[in-house]
Design a protein with these regions (language model features):
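Surface-exposed, low-hydrophobicity beta-strand/loop segments enriched in small/polar/acidic residues
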Residues: 1-161
Length: 161
């Protein structure tokens, strides 16, 4: 996983007004991943288990972006191990954050320009919009080159769509 050189935290908005969620991580993930409730696992101590989003590209779903675990000294480039307690953030329009953007097609070398619109991809990442998606949740806020298939943390703004 590579990342934007200018930031070291997922949530960039200074006074976030979206919703913070907590849960338990099913399998290891990097911060910036879009998460979903693992419907096959009952809540543990009142907390749901979460996994990387598995929906088909472009489908509508709750946006819950995995945050870094700064309370134990982790950064947004540190993978979070499975079965750890996690925090996520559900952005509102205008919120700025870092999300994992992956290369589409061949898997390497994609570039994103400021203003590009992103859609959800399988595996909890986002890709440039294609076709007629149900939801286009983010707009790119920085130019990124050589986006990788495993995901590159990219500065985005939530669109609310």
């Amino acid at each position: 996983m590579t990342m934007s050189a200018s930031h070291n935290t997922i949530l960039l908005t200074s006074a976030p007004m979206g919703r913070f969620l907590e849960g338990i991580l099913n399998t290891a993930c990097y911060p910036g991943t879009n998460m979903e409730v693992d419907a096959a696992v009952e809540p543990i101590g009142g907390k749901h288990t979460w996994q990387a989003s598995s929906l088909t590209t472009g489908q509508r779903q709750l946006l819950a972006i995995l945050l870094e675990n700064e309370m134990v000294g982790k950064t947004c480039s540190d993978q979070i191990a499975d079965e750890q307690k996690i925090r996520m953030y559900c952005p509102i329009p205008g919120d700025e954050l870092l999300v994992l953007v992956s290369a589409s097609g061949t898997g390497t070398g994609d570039a994103q320009a400021i203003g590009d619109i992103l859609i959800r991809a399988s595996g909890g990442t986002f890709i440039a919009t294609t076709g007629t998606p149900e939801q286009e949740p983010f707009q790119v806020m920085e130019t990124m080159t050589d986006v990788t298939s495993t995901g590159t943390l990219t500065h985005v703004m939530a669109t609310g769509t």
